[in-house]
Amino acid sequence: MKKIAILALALVLALVPTLTLADETVRLGVTGAFYEDLWQPAIDKLAEEGIKVELVQFSDFSLPNNALNGGELEVNAFQHHAYFNNDTTTNGYDLQVLADTFVITMNLYSAKYPTVEELQAKVAAGEAVNVVIPNDATNQGRALLVLKDAGIIDLTDDYEGTPNTENVVQVEGGKVELTPVNAAQTYQFLEDSDAAVINGNYAASYGVDPASAIFQENVDLSDERFICLIAVRTADIDNPTYQRVAEVFRSDVTTQVVKEKFDGFFYLTWDNE
């Protein structure tokens, strides 16, 4: 009888994680319509396990961390480490990184110049050039690095983390004017500028082909700054449901949809672990 009781208890304990994960709704904050396609395979798989994931769309990068910190979300997945570190420190949010996900490219696009060499030639000729960049600190810094690598501007080397506009130096003869706008609006200024540096999530949301970029960002997965992440409140870092959400997303179901719909936009961290 004692042996039966022990076996019964062991069976109950084995079922506890499954019961804990069942019938829960996880509100997940994102920025951009493409996340609906990106997350759908994981959402479907999680639903089979009794975990309902509800995507909550935000129109601006400044909102999802505030919503997560305030309890309006359980999880968010929209930002890279550089943004997360700056935003949580600046605003005193009590958030933690649950898992790394991918690097989403930030590329240089132009509606006027089919190649970066043609844009470089205009800069070298001393003609006025207007380039649109994001206006938030971390995405702007990343955009400036893209422009430097593309040969459109130069930068001083006395910055920490990512540069800002004070670090911008004109290349010889250059007259490049930078126009900072909300990151979500960079694509909308493409037709009215010489070029624009556009976050991949917004480019994907507008159906932009990443191959149409006149310069593609040099992606380094050993550099944590621009690796995107899934975040939770610090108190929830060990929550098995949220850990399971991250685990399923970081799996073959997402790899497949990236290959089918978003090839060229994402570099998946779990492919290199």
Regions found by a protein language model. Give the residues of each.
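Periplasmic-binding protein-like
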Residues: 139-148, 249-270
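Short helix-initiation/N-cap motifs at beta->coil->alpha
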Residues: 55-66, 159-188
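Ligand-binding "clamshell"
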Residues: 86-98, 111-117, 190-192, 197, ...
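Pocket-flanking alpha-helical
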Residues: 61-92, 203-207
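Alpha-to-beta junction loops
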Residues: 69-79, 129, 174-177, 191-198
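Short, polar/charged alpha-helical segment
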Residues: 25, 32-57, 63, 67
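A conserved helix-loop-strand patch within extracytoplasmic ligand-binding domains
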Residues: 94, 98-153, 255
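A bilobed periplasmic-binding-protein/Venus flytrap-type ligand-binding module shared by bacterial periplasmic
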Residues: 105-118, 226-244
